[in-house]
Amino acid sequence: MSILLKGAKIVDNKSNYNFIQKDILINDGVITDIADNINSKASKVLNLENLHVSRGWMDTSVSFGEPGFEERETILNGLYTSAASGFTSILLNPNCFPLIDNHSSVEFLKRKSKDQTSQIYPIANLTINSSGEELTSLYDMKTAGAVAFGDYKKVINDSSMLKIGRAHV
């Protein structure tokens, strides 16, 4: 099946076509041509006002059931849904059980998304057991792939805890 996108604005800062309007020809799910005016007998032609095309989007607040609540949603199902919705990157909240509060839990999440269309960027817990009392191993989790820290919807009353946490990252 072939699809022709007419006059699509390309949003991709790694491309020579960034913020430029072009026609895009897609054959069997693969972009085969990008040009000013493609005249092709495509199976489907989309000529929509304000059409934009990009590599993918990032969702900065995602919650899956796994680990711990797989009956709600598994990581693989969540990643499939994210990809089908156009998200190639997701920040996964630390609201699972066990909590994302150590190196191996961050590695587990990164490993689960390794060969998937959507990639997980874990938000790890700032404090052990989300208690707001003792910091987790922030440096270790950062080296494992955590991109942010927080105790998901729990207030951290000790501002020095936040300052120390920030200094460790």
Which role does the model predict for each range below?
Residues M1-S40:
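N-terminal metal-binding scaffold of metallo-dependent hydrolase/deaminase domains
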Residues L5, K44-L46, M58, L91, ...:
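Hydrophobic/aromatic beta-strand patches that form the interior of the parallel beta-sheet core
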Residues A8, I24, G29, N50, ...:
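Divalent metal-coordination and catalytic microenvironments
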Residues V11, N93, Y152:
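Conserved residues at the C-terminal ends of beta-strands
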Residues N37-V53:
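Active-site metal-binding motif and surrounding structural segment of the metallo-beta-lactamase
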Residues E49-S113:
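Metal-associated gating/positioning segment near the N- to mid-region
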Residues C96-F108, S113-H168:
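Histidine/acidic-residue-rich, glycine-tolerant segments that coordinate divalent metal ions
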